[in-house]
Amino acid sequence: MEAQIHILEQEAYSAVLRAFQAQADEFSWDKATVMTNLRKELRISDDENRQLLNNVHNDDLIKRIRDSRPRGGNQVVRHQSLDVHPSPTFSASRKKQKTFQSYPSIGSTRSKSFNNRVVSANEPAEALIGRKVWTKWPEDNSFYEAVVTQYNANEGRHALVYDINTVNETWEWVDLNEIPTKDIRWDGEEDGVTLNVGHGGGTTRGNRRTLSHGGRGRGPRTQPRREHLATENGGGRKFFGEIELFNTDSLVKEVERVFDSNLPDPHELDKAKKLLKEHEQALIAAIARLTDASDYESDGEEPYSHELPMLLG
């Protein structure tokens, strides 16, 4: 039963990925957050995530939708106030061959445009989860975008995930108080705002990279046991209503029919997009119900979890 549920979870995750990819070439921040939450709820491992992303990128239907999309439309604006330069290739000492989206050293942010949401001096460490941040790596003097996904209170460290929801996703555990204020920028931070997340101390960055195996952003995932939901009315199994979804094969054929034509009818294009959107919403609703059902069916087994481990160097 558990294996069958996980197959459904993979199919659901892949379907949402495809729908998002069909809507736009790049994920908005809201969609990236949705996918991160889905990975947790659907127990999608790192390897599974990479494989599913590759499958979506190589999907013929998605390619046709991309090719038919007007260039410059529906694109996500990525902080145009920061001059993005080509990402450097890191040395072998980092034990990985990849690049991050990077930003030149921004020094003073007086001329930069951030939104008005700032980091409060008394803000608890957990409140930073979900925030977007740029940290500077001394090796190339460039800033790299990440999102804070977790906080370990015992160690006083936050998990920073780079290239989130992509095949290049990597992460590290960081004591944010070890990073000099000039080397960190928050989405929503104005010039002169200092960071104080209420834990630890120190002003040096020497112990920042604590991953002793596999370089920055690599390490095994933990699989803690999940607690079961309490049964209602003193016992018995909770029965869930039927889940109704579009027939995926029929939906794909309908969308392919629209995009296979040389001059797609705008009305038909809108209809296809609406179908994809409705399918996406139905899948998200079904996923929530499947997650509840999985809790009752797991019966003490340890499902996947995607919390990042603390690697002690």
Swiss-Prot record:
Residues 35-58, 267-293 form a coiled coil. Keywords: Coiled coil, Nucleus, Phosphoprotein, Plant defense. InterPro entries: Agenet_dom_plant, EMSY-LIKE_plant, ENT_dom, ENT_dom-like_sf. Disruption phenotype: Reduced resistance to Hyaloperonospora arabidopsidis isolate Hiks1. Slight early flowering phenotype. GO terms for cellular component: nucleus. Induction: Slightly induced by heat stress. PROSITE patterns: ENT. Residues 84-106, 195-229, 294-313 are annotated as: Disordered. One of its GO terms (biological process) is vegetative to reproductive phase transition of meristem. Residues 206-219 have a biased composition (Basic residues). The modification Phosphoserine is found at S294. Residues 1-88 form the ENT domain. It is found in: Nucleus. Interacts with EDM2 in nucleus. Probably involved in the regulation of chromatin states. Contributes to RPP7-mediated and basal immunity, especially against Hyaloperonospora arabidopsidis isolate Hiks1. Regulates negatively EDM2-dependent floral transition. This is Protein EMSY-LIKE 2. It comes from Arabidopsis thaliana. The gene is EML2.
